[in-house]
Swiss-Prot record:
It catalyses: L-citrulline + L-aspartate + ATP = 2-(N(omega)-L-arginino)succinate + AMP + diphosphate + H(+). It is an enzyme of class 6 (ligase). Transmembrane segments: none annotated. L-aspartate binds at residues 117, 121-122. The keyword Amino-acid biosynthesis applies. This is Argininosuccinate synthase. It comes from Streptococcus mutans serotype c (strain ATCC 700610 / UA159). Pathway: Amino-acid biosynthesis; L-arginine biosynthesis; L-arginine from L-ornithine and carbamoyl phosphate: step 2/3. The lineage of its organism: Bacteria, Bacillati, Bacillota, Bacilli, Lactobacillales.
């Protein structure tokens, strides 16, 4: 009698490799590894899954879909969780979940498995997303069920012929994609410890960064980055190029004690050189193209959207409604920002746009001034009238 199929989100690491061995007792395991820009050896991971016991192994390059459908909306919404974290891991979980569900449908699987522990946010993100996309699918979390110590897991792996990675003594837990790199555990768990240089992987320290500044022109069309220094490229490629360029200058290091969805505080080290550079540049183009009312209202929704994404609710109607509003605001967000990369900072030093609402003739204090200053008298009287009336009535 054939077994039921289970779709396993497979990373190639110890946890999900052991999960294959554990799951194959009751299921035919289909391993799925997705490339969202982490730079792994995908062919090795594909073969390892089969070697460990999966009946099928999928490797999917979803960098472009991730960039266009998940990263771009977050960029346009200036999505920072708690004003610091650009949602590196939180953004990739919805697209990974979507692909897992698609493969479950293609293969006739009734169950999806992931390698998350019972302590983190990702278990919630995967399971809420999968339930939103297909409530009939069952989800299991082997690592959460085991409750093994690391030593017990290693012993199980050795007993069952699962290769134990050579770098297993690395104290850090790293997650990486196009939008950045997240690192936790080890000495980072004590928030009084300064993060050592070994904890960073894609950025130079300020001390190691070049002593000469570098400039890059980033061009936006309807809020989407489309070119670097006049060279058009796909969004995923543009982000990757900026990760290297801005990372060289030490841009995008973030040390954050954040409030996790599961109720605890966690100290995380993020490296987001491309993300921070693009978020900075995009905001400056918005500043010269959006009317005041949109500029003031949009951040309110941006903060709420950041919380929704972080808290596993990408597929919630509230998220999609806010994203629709954000998209509507981007129609005239066209232009180029000149960004100075130097010693850990990405600073916009010049900007231009064919839809700029900045009128130099209105702003200037020279003889070219076209602002009607005589109109200010009546404006001030009417603007202050409610306050004046309140004082007359209540401050007797």
């Amino acid at each position: 009698m054939s077994k039921e199929k289970v779709i396993l989100a497979y990373s190639g690491g110890l946890d999900t490799s052991v999960a294959i061995t554990w799951l194959k007792k009751d299921y035919d395991v289909v391993a799925v590894c997705m490339d969202v820009g982490e730079g792994k050896d995908l062919e090795f991971i594909h073969d390892k899954a089969l070697k460990v016991g999966a009946i099928e192994s999928y490797v999917l390059d979803i960098k472009d879909e991730f960039a266009e459908e998940y990263v771009l909306p977050a960029l346009q919404a200036h999505a920072y969780y708690e004003q610091k974290y650009p949602l590196v891991s939180a953004l990739s979980r919805p697209v990974i979940s979507k692909k897992l569900v698609e493969i479950a449908h293609q293969t006739g699987a009734t169950t999806i498995a992931h390698g998350c522990t019972g302590k983190g946010n990702d278990q919630v993100r995967f399971e809420v997303a999968i339930a939103a996309l297909d409530p009939k699918l069952k989800v299991i979390a082997p690592v959460r069920e085991w409750k093994w110590s690391r030593e017990e897991e290693i012993n199980y792996a050795k007993e069952n012929g699962v290769p134990v990675p050579a770098d297993l003594d690395n104290p850090y837990s790293v997650d990486q994609n196009l939008w950045g790199r997240a690192n936790e555990c080890g000495v980072l768990e004590n928030p009084w410890n300064q993060a050592p240089e070994e904890a960073f992987g894609i950025t130079n320290s300020v001390e190691e960064a070049p002593d000469k500044a570098e400039y890059v022109d980033i061009t936006f069309k309807e809020g989407k980055p489309v070119a670097l220094d006049g060279q058009e490229m796909k969004l995923a490629d543009l982000i990757q190029k900026l990760n290297v360029l801005a990372g060289k200058h030490g841009v995008g290091r973030i040390d954050h004690v954040e409030n996790r969805l599961v109720g605890i505080k966690s100290r995380e080290i993020y490296e987001c050189p491309g993300a921070v550079t693009l978020l900075t540049a995009h905001k400056e183009i918005e500043d010269i193209t959006l009317v005041r009312e949109v500029s003031h209202f949009k951040p309110i929704l941006e903060n709420e959207l950041s919380n929704l994404i972080y808290n596993a609710l990408w597929f919630n109607p509230a998220t999609q409604a806010i994203l629709a509003y954000i998209t509507e605001t981007q129609k005239e967000v066209n232009g180029t920002a000149k960004v100075k990369l130097y010693k850990g900072s990405a600073r916009v030093v010049a900007r231009k746009s064919p839809h700029s609402l900045y009128d130099e003739n209105l702003a200037t204090y020279t003889s070219a001034d076209s602002f009607d200053q005589d109109a200010a008298v009546g404006f001030i009287k009417l603007w202050g009238l409610p306050t004046q009336v309140n004082s007359q009535v209540n401050n007797k």
